């Protein structure tokens, strides 16, 4: 039985949404990738920073909506965002987190109970996992889901618009498709601007500063067939790279590929 099928069975038995059941599973230490988990529900990237930096970071997200589309934001010190889900706790409901100090990643805990502070503001940013459901519904193959690994992600030479101390390159995720499939993928994902929208680049990875497509900066490599082209979407790991470059004294993000699963429905994010 697949992880997704087992999750659905557990949710049905408990009378819960699959998204809620997934959060409960992660809360108890089950740390698998969230790709393909709780299909139909919106997944989000996390950026958790001290309140004193939150204004500049919020502005950064507004200036860079492709990689940083905000779908939720907490009050300072509040680990709950009710609009995103019932019984949702930012401190425990993600499979793995990253703790940053002065720009260095110092720990990858499975919960934040020992790290939580009253001044922390959580930003939840849209994730491309959400539009993957629409791609698969149209019959398009998603390579990293087929292979049971994390989506490959790369730093690029595409500069984000800076805000205060927040600046740096865009990070992109990659999915390979045959040319006709790539055209269809553009058409489908254009409908989902709240989760990165249309791709930012197709083919020739060197044009956006990617030297070796087989060596991603985050996630896992996937094969690209000789009859396929790589298609790149803006990625919510961008703020992770930007926060690290800003060398904040303290910050928290999710571990790449291990997202927050919300109770929002993917179909409700479509604009057409």
Curated annotation (Swiss-Prot):
Keyword Lyase included in the entry's annotation: yes
Keywords: Lyase
One Pfam family hit: D-Glu_cyclase
InterPro entries: D-Glu_cyclase, Putative_hydro-lyase, UPF0317
Claim: Nuclease is one of the keywords in the record: no
GO molecular function terms noted in the UniProt entry: lyase activity
Gene3D superfamilies cross-referenced by the UniProt entry: PSTPO5379-like, PSTPO5379-like domain
Enzyme Commission number(s): 4.2.1.-
Catalytic class of the enzyme: lyase
Source domain of life: Bacteria
UniProt xrefs under SUPFAM superfamilies: PSTPO5379-like (SSF160920)
PANTHER family: D-GLUTAMATE CYCLASE, MITOCHONDRIAL
Family, similarity comment: Belongs to the D-glutamate cyclase family.
Protein name: Putative hydro-lyase BRADO2538
């Amino acid at each position: 039985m697949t992880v997704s099928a087992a999750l659905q069975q557990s949710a049905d038995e408990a009378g819960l949404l699959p998204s809620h059941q997934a959060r409960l599973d992660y809360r108890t230490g089950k740390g698998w990738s969230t790709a393909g988990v709780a299909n139909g529900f919106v997944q989000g990237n996390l950026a958790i920073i001290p309140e004193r930096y939150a204004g500049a970071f919020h502005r950064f997200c507004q200036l860079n909506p492709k990689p940083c589309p905000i779908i939720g934001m907490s009050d300072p010190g509040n680990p709950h965002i009710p609009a995103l889900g019932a019984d949702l706790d930012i401190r425990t409901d993600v499979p793995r987190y990253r703790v940053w100090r002065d720009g260095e990643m110092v720990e990858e805990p499975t919960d934040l109970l020992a790290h939580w502070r009253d001044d922390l503001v959580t930003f939840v940013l849209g994730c491309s996992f959400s539009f993957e459901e629409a791609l698969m519904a149209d019959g398009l193959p998603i390579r990293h889901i087929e292979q049971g690994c994390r989506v490959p992600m790369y730093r690029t030479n595409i500069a984000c618009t800076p805000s205060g101390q927040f600046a740096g390159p865009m990070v992109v995720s990659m999915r390979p498709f045959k040319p006709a499939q790539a055209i269809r993928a553009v058409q489908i994902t254009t409908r989902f601007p709240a989760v990165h929208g249309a791709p930012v680049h197709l083919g020739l990875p060197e044009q956006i500063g990617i030297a070796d497509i087989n060596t991603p900066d985050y996630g896992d490599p996937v094969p690209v067939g000789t009859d396929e082209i790589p298609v790149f979407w803006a990625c919510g790991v961008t703020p992770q790279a930007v926060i690290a470059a800003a060398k904040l004294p303290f910050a928290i993000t999710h571990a790449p590929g291990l997202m927050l699963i919300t109770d929002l429905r993917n179909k409700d994010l479509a604009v057409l």
